């Protein structure tokens, strides 16, 4: 594993089911630089709730010809490789990933992850720790909230700044990291 490298990940779902991924965005960060991005719409093969559409703006017709998760997942894993994954509110995103992998009948990969929301709560003094509020805390421009690629970029920028308070990324993953396999 490269010393200071990680992948920031974000999902949007079509409805309340954790298996209804309709968009995925990821950014790879190596030595404090975003080096690669990954973004795709995903056909959830499920209904869209009006509540979720209001959040992310993705309509059923937007994903009609999009690949399904079983097609996208191998490309996601190739992008992630052996890097740790970070998500802002990882409890949601990692449950989405875990349940979607189970739904397509594949084994859960050995994947280390941590949560930038929880790391922020342990690291900085802010009145709120949501993605938008942390971007404001660090005085960073933030446009397109609930667009998976923009949210993954925001998560990466926040994480990079939070990591400056620690010895290195390995230290953070050893203390706060979890493994997707443990969701069992």
Which residues are covered by each model-predicted region?
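Acidic two-metal-ion nuclease catalytic site recognized across multiple nuclease folds
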Residues: 1, 157-184
């Amino acid at each position: 594993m490269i010393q200071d490298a990680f992948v920031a990940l974000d999902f949007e779902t079509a409805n309340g089911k954790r298996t209804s991924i309709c968009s995925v965005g990821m950014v790879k960060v190596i030595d404090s630089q975003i080096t690669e991005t990954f973004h795709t719409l995903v056909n959830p093969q499920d209904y869209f709730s009006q509540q979720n559409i209001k959040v992310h703006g993705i309509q059923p017709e937007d994903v009609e010809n999009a690949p399904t998760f079983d097609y996208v997942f191998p490309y996601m894993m190739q992008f992630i490789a052996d890097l740790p994954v970070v998500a802002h509110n990882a409890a949601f995103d990692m449950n989405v990933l875990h349940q979607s992998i189970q739904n397509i009948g594949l084994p859960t990969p050995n994947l280390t992850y941590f949560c930038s929301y929880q790391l922020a709560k342990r690291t900085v003094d802010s009145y709120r720790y949501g993605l938008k509020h942390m971007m404001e805390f660090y005085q960073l421009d933030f446009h397109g909230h609930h667009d998976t690629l923009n949210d993954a970029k925001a998560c990466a920028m926040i994480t990079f700044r939070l990591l400056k308070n620690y010895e290195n990324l390995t230290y953070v993953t050893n203390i706060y990291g979890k493994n997707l396999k443990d969701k069992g």
